Amino acid sequence: MRNAWEVNFDGLVGLTHNYAGLLFGNEASTRHRFQVSNPRLAAKQGLLKMKNLADAGFPQAVIPPHERPFIPVLRQLGFSGSDEQVLEKVARQAPHWLSSVSSASPMWVANAATIAPSVDTLDGKVHRTVANLNNKFHRSLEAPVTESLLKAIFNDEEKFSVHSALPQVALLGDEGAANHNRLGGHYGEPGMQLFVYGREKGNDTRPSRYPARQTREASEAVARLNQVNPQQVIFAQQNPDVIDQGVFHNDVIAVSNRQVLFCHQQAFARQSQLLANLRARVNGFMAIEVPATQVSVSDAVSTYLFNSQLLSRDDGSMMLVLPQECREHAGVWCYLNELLAADNPISELKVFDLRESMANGGGPACLRLRVVLTEEERRAVNPAVMMNDTLFNALNDWGDRYYRDRLTDADLADPQLLREGREALDVLSQLLNLGSVYPFQREGGGNG
């Protein structure tokens, strides 16, 4: 067995973090629509989580935000003139498009890509397939820049492969690692990859109220692209009833780490059959199923109990990283303390205040992309993105300089916000040694 570790790459909240309520099916996003946001606080909350976990011995890195508002797409939609004129026209004629191209949703990097560690792949490389995020227009814009960022971070082509997103069609809707779990023993051992989908062609079992964003066809294609050993793959359908209750990704109802699957009793279709399959194929497999009598699906969604991070310590014990909302819900907090006392590897609860992200429907797990790496692979990652004291202080200073502490829907049309964002990303891409990863850098900001 090779030594390997899980490295969490967290998305840095973007400068246009706002509450536009764009995510139908994500009830927190809809509920907080048009509230005033605080991008600077959002960025600091995310950075504090990264630094705390890094200090606790969990390898941690950062993925930068995308350029927003994203002017090239507005030009594709027929708005012309200088960048300032484009902003003015879209704000006056079609403000909904301005909201869409200003979303800071790339911060939820659990949707950036699906990862396959080298120990699981046929060619022995670490593979990642960028998610097309086809179901939501504003998220479907992310794939090209996500690909550029991942190639700048994982730039050793002998060790890493980055695959472009699947074609942008509904049949191949792919939401990345948020619908993917890996189960097994030590990180350096081969694992069982669990791909979770919401719908498939020819199957009438699907939600009726909210969309199922992930298709089985997409999951199968991603497994092929990532060259996952076919003996190490399971495809499972998420329970359509919980999708209709606001569980838009599997990471809102389940989280795995090594041999443990922590999930709600109603997370999967044919759940008992799936768990029996995992017990047969994963040595030491342990399912921690939360009964609906103790935590309802509604409470799981409102607190993001399962949108948590389950992290392994060297001694085999695990820490559960939770949003503040879990501690503030009496029933959920009572259950969690019972969980601590029970016979399972979870020995610590770690709570973070992530309210700015939570109000848009993204908890601790949404903000991170986990990547299993050997020591040699970790050394091959762009070192400038690895979290440490120096980077933490530099990013906090950078955020204080460029991020606003108040942002409303109307502010998105401010040309100064666009200029601030581009200057900030120029500085950040130098700080993180990324090269020219943003379209405005390659086009000189262009006025069309």
UniProtKB/Swiss-Prot annotation:
Any GO molecular function: N-succinylarginine dihydrolase activity
Annotated catalytic residues: E175, H249, C366 (nucleophile)
Assembly with partners or alone: Homodimer.
Catalysed reactions, semicolon-separated: N(2)-succinyl-L-arginine + 2 H2O + 2 H(+) = N(2)-succinyl-L-ornithine + 2 NH4(+) + CO2
Originating species: Shigella dysenteriae serotype 1 (strain Sd197)
Taxonomic placement: Bacteria, Pseudomonadati, Pseudomonadota, Gammaproteobacteria, Enterobacterales
Homology family: Belongs to the succinylarginine dihydrolase family.
GO biological process annotation, one example: arginine catabolic process to glutamate
Keywords: Arginine metabolism, Hydrolase
Gene: astB
Pathway the protein takes part in: Amino-acid degradation; L-arginine degradation via AST pathway; L-glutamate and succinate from L-arginine: step 2/5
Keyword field contains tRNA-binding: no
Cited function: Catalyzes the hydrolysis of N(2)-succinylarginine into N(2)-succinylornithine, ammonia and CO(2).
Transmembrane segments: none
Protein name stated in the entry: N-succinylarginine dihydrolase
Its EC number(s): 3.5.3.23
Enzyme class: hydrolase
Signal peptide region: none
Pfam families: AstB
